[in-house]
């Protein structure tokens, strides 16, 4: 994993503007605004506000990106305060290799060692078998089905939680 960089715009476009990649997230996002999104993400990662990591399958080729995994805090929208959420995307040509699960586990291990994130929530689409399998395999607890608003769209998701300090076993 490496922090997002300003030259990751093409990877963002491939992930966020593609109808297949965004199928479970309500459809592709418009290309306009992606450059600004990358700049914001670079700033937030550099400030250590959010952990926005690019999945790099080969450290010798850091420009080859397989996807992204992100850990961030936000208001739960229901008056319950801040929650920590994790999300990930893996490009089609890299799917099925275990990279998503490894990236999520690695970021959760870093969160455990850092100690500031607390319980982590994940909201994969109800029909996203691979992402729900990652949650199961890493010890997330299934909370239930949950509507989530993303980019002005209401998504049908499964709500999972994990406490990295308690639920992750050391490798």
Task: Please place each PLM-identified region on the residue numbering.
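GNAT-family acyltransferases
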Residues: 1-93, 109-110, 114, 141-144, ...
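A local structural micro-motif
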Residues: 24, 102, 119-120, 143
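Charged, low-complexity surface patches
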Residues: 83, 100, 124
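Conserved acetyl-CoA-binding loop-helix of GNAT-fold acetyltransferases
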Residues: 89-90, 96-111, 129-137
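Helix N-cap/coil-helix junction residues
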Residues: 99, 116-117, 140
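Conserved GNAT acetyl-CoA-binding A-motif
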Residues: 114-123
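Short histidine
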Residues: 124, 131, 143
């Amino acid at each position: 994993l490496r922090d997002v960089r300003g030259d990751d715009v093409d990877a963002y476009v491939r992930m966020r503007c593609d109808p297949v990649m965004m199928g479970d997230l309500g459809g592709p996002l418009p290309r306009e605004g992606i450059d600004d999104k990358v700049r914001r993400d670079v700033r937030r990662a550099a400030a250590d506000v959010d952990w926005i990591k690019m999945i790099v399958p080969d450290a010798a080729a850091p420009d080859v990106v397989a996807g992204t995994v992100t850990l961030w805090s936000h208001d739960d929208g229901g008056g319950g305060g801040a929650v920590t959420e994790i999300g990930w995307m893996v490009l089609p040509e890299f799917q099925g290799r275990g990279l998503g699960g490894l990236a999520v586990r690695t970021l959760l291990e870093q969160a455990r060692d850092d100690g500031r994130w607390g319980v982590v929530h994940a909201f994969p689409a109800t029909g996203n078998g691979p992402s729900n399998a990652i949650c199961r395999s890493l010890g997330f607890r299934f909370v239930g089905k949950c509507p989530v608003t993303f980019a002005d769209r209401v998504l049908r998701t499964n709500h999972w939680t994990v406490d990295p300090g308690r639920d992750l076993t050391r490798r």
